[in-house]
């Protein structure tokens, strides 16, 4: 007899307005001396591990390209939640950029490991590439 398939976690992005996997923000116009210029996306985490699981979502912003994961950068935002098996967690993530340039916004999914009593990187992540330009 075959054993059941191993459980998994998943993370994906949805656009802010329609909550669909299309029309992600790619360009941000920085508005002079007004408030911070921001973009928002929905980050969705799903638990298909067969049991309750605690997750940590780290939001990081880096200039330019990413060479490896997890990204060597401090998290701008951190979210923690325990999900039941089959449960979905939707986080509205907002990113503020004030300097022109090319950015990678990274959402890393970390999973709680009871043996080490720490969150470990799941190797599941999403990257949103955004070019920020100044209003002319």
Question: Where are these predicted regions, by residue range?
Answer:
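Short solvent-exposed strand-capping/beta-turn motif centered on an Asx-Ser/Thr pair
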Residues: 46-51, 98-100
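Short aromatic-acidic-glycine turn motif
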Residues: 3-22, 61-73, 114-119
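Intrinsically disordered, low-complexity Pro/Gly/Ser/Thr-rich segments with frequent PxxP/GP/PP motifs
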Residues: 71-100
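Short edge beta-strand/loop segments characteristic of extracellular beta-sandwich folds
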Residues: 40-48, 94
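Beta-sheet-dominated interaction scaffolds and their linkers
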Residues: 8-42
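Short acidic, flexible loop segments centered on an aromatic residue
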Residues: 50-66, 109-110
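Terminal connector regions
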Residues: 97-136
């Amino acid at each position: 007899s075959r054993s059941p398939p191993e459980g998994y976690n998943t993370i994906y992005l949805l656009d802010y307005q329609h909550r669909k996997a299309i029309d992600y923000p790619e360009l941000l116009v920085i508005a002079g001396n007004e408030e911070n210029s921001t973009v928002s996306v929905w980050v969705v985490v799903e638990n298909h591990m067969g049991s309750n699981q605690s997750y940590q979502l780290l939001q990081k912003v880096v200039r330019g390209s990413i060479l490896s994961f997890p990204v060597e950068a401090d998290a701008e935002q951190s979210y923690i939640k325990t999900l039941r098996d089959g449960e979905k967690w939707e986080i509205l993530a907002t990113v503020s950029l004030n300097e022109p340039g090319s950015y990678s916004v990274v959402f890393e999914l970390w999973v709680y490991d009871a043996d080490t009593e720490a969150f470990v990187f799941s190797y599941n992540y999403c990257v949103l590439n955004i070019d920020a330009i100044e209003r002319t």
